[in-house]
Structure formats: structure tokens, C-alpha cells
């Protein structure tokens, strides 16, 4: 919802896809009457046909309590969600930004990590559904960029917490 607020402030048109697995409609309630905002209940593991010029791909449960609740869905969201968003970007010529995570480094052996550091990962641990899903999403992005010349950016987000996020008290 912070990104939506900023994009609407910049007078951008925003189409928000959400399946409400970790989000709440109330997070974007104040934008529902904005003519530049459209909310679609949709799971990105399913393809969607839209006409857009930018895609901000943020879909994936990022909290351990969420991604461990259904680890297969978490991996599927990272893989199929990214695959579907990349397919959309390719079809309409949109730029895409993938929200990845510092978790792709696994249990790093160097601090701080450089962009060239490949990490020290556990592919079968309890957190692997999230970590490896994001690594796979980054791989898909790199392959789409090389093979289809899709304009892609990847941001690796480290620890975050703030307004609109669910706390353990609410779960």
C-alpha cells in the first residue's frame, strides 16, 4: 500500500493484484474511489491478461509464519507468479521489478554481502520454500532478460517491518 500511495501521488494509474493471503483489503481501502486505482482479487500463480507498462512484482509471503504455513504455495508463488508476470511483461513490453530478498544468500559466510556473493544455502531446510523460491525467481528474470530482452530490475530487500504489516498479535 505504500507503493500504491506513492504511485498515485505521482499520478500513475495503478492496477493492484492481491489474493489476500497475507494482505488485507483495508490496506488499500482509501484508494478504492480513486479513478487511477483498480483492485483485482487475483492469485499470480494463474495467468492474467492486462495492458500495463510497468510491473512491480511483490507477490510472495515473506514472513516465516506465512511461508511455512503452506511451503508448497510459497514456492509456487515465487515460481509461477514470477513466470506469469514475466510472460505478461514480455507480451506487453512492460518493465518489471522483482522484489527479492536477502534470504537468497542463505547463511552468509561474509558480511556485508556483495552483489557477486552467491551465498551459502540450505536447499531442503524449513525456510527453503522462500529462499529457494526467490532464487528461482531471480534465475527466471535473468533468463527472460537474456532470451527475450525483457527490461528487468531485481531488488533484494533485507529485514523490514512497518505500518500495514501483520503482527503476531493479529494472527
Provide a role label for each language-model segment.
Residues 1-160:
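N-terminal Rossmann-like NAD(P)+-binding domain of SDR-like oxidoreductases, especially those catalyzing
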Residues 169-171:
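Conserved small/polar residues in nucleotide/adenosyl-binding loops
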Residues 164:
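Conserved GTPase G-domain signal focused on the G5
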Amino acid at each position: 500500500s505504500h507503493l500504491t500511495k506513492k504511485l498515485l501521488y505521482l499520478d500513475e494509474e495503478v492496477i493492484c493484484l492481491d489474493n489476500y493471503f497475507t494482505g488485507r483489503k483495508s490496506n488499500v481501502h482509501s484508494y478504492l474511489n480513486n479513478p487511477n486505482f483498480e483492485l483485482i482479487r487475483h492469485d499470480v500463480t494463474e495467468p492474467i491478461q492486462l495492458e500495463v507498462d510497468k510491473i512491480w512484482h511483490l507477490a510472495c509471503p515473506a514472513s516465516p509464519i506465512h511461508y511455512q504455513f503452506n511451503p508448497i504455495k510459497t514456492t509456487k508463488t515465487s515460481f509461477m507468479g514470477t513466470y506469469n508476470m514475466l510472460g505478461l511483461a514480455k507480451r506487453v513490453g512492460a518493465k518489471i521489478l522483482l522484489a527479492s530478498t536477502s534470504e537468497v544468500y542463505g547463511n552468509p559466510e561474509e558480511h556485508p554481502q556483495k552483489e557477486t556473493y552467491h551465498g551459502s544455502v540450505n536447499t531442503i531446510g524449513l525456510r527453503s520454500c522462500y529462499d529457494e523460491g526467490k532464487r528461482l525467481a531471480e534465475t527466471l528474470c535473468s533468463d527472460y532478460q537474456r532470451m527475450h530482452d525483457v527490461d528487468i530490475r531485481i531488488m533484494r530487500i533485507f529485514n523490514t517491518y512497518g505500518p500495514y504489516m501483520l503482527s503476531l498479535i493479529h494472527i
